Amino acid sequence: MIVCTTENIAGYRIDKTFGEVFGLTTRSRNLVRTFGAGLKTLVGGEVVTWTQLQDQARLEAIERLKNNADKIGANAVTMMRFDSNEANGIMSVVAYGTAVKVSEL
């Protein structure tokens, strides 16, 4: 499955457009790690726990995006983007784009 952030894929032509497709994940933070991360904000620097959580969520959202595109017959996703939201220690990440069927030129 090809996933790109551009409208076109070099070396391929778009044969069919299926439309919007997305992958969503929602994760909660570990209370102990959140407390430790809160202490880290007092001294500055990267909050590794939160970075890892966001990275895992983005990877999971992309995998779900690919699975959803595959289910409708697409073999690529163009114009892929991320959106995220966090409230009360719960983080949602969505990967979305346009599901397409492509073939090599």
Curated annotation (Swiss-Prot):
Alphabetized PANTHER family for the sequence: UPF0145 PROTEIN SCO3412, UPF0145 PROTEIN YBJQ
Name the UniProt record assigns to this protein: UPF0145 protein OEOE_0637
SUPFAM superfamilies in UniProt: YbjQ-like
Family classification: Belongs to the UPF0145 family.
Organism for this UniProt entry: Oenococcus oeni (strain ATCC BAA-331 / PSU-1)
Pfam families the record matches: YbjQ_1
